[in-house]
């Protein structure tokens, strides 16, 4: 009988991937990036370990959503003070902080525990095409072609 092998922390090879978010649909991009952050694309995937890779997302300001979500989708945050609820539409947040839209979408697809917080630290999102991670020589991650159609 074969036994399930659990990879040791030292044996996990981490790669860097570059994702161009230009003209990508937000949810479709987020699911694929979350899967790579978790390491689900590797044969050594273990649910309780961080086996994933680093992901750099560029052109976050050019992400798109389908339908009328640009005007209807709302992002809420609360300061913790009475009356401290702030509500902002997708379009307003994209003009102000486009990185936050991508980060929030991907973070919601990661585990909601300490492992998810550790995985989220491996995500780097930038507004434009420039990023400071060229020393890591990130490979371009090809997303599903259906994600960029329409």
From Swiss-Prot:
Gene3D superfamilies: Ribosomal protein L13. It comes from the Bacteria. GO terms for biological process: negative regulation of translation; translation. One of its GO terms (molecular function) is mRNA binding. Keywords: Ribonucleoprotein, Ribosomal protein. GO terms for cellular component: cytosolic large ribosomal subunit. InterPro entries: Ribosomal_uL13, Ribosomal_uL13_bac-type, Ribosomal_uL13_CS, Ribosomal_uL13_sf. Residues 129-150 are annotated as: Disordered. Residues 136-150 have a biased composition (Polar residues). This protein is one of the early assembly proteins of the 50S ribosomal subunit, although it is not seen to bind rRNA by itself. It is important during the early stages of 50S assembly. Part of the 50S ribosomal subunit. PANTHER family: LARGE RIBOSOMAL SUBUNIT PROTEIN UL13M, RIBOSOMAL PROTEIN L13. Belongs to the universal ribosomal protein uL13 family. This is Large ribosomal subunit protein uL13. It comes from Prochlorococcus marinus (strain MIT 9313).
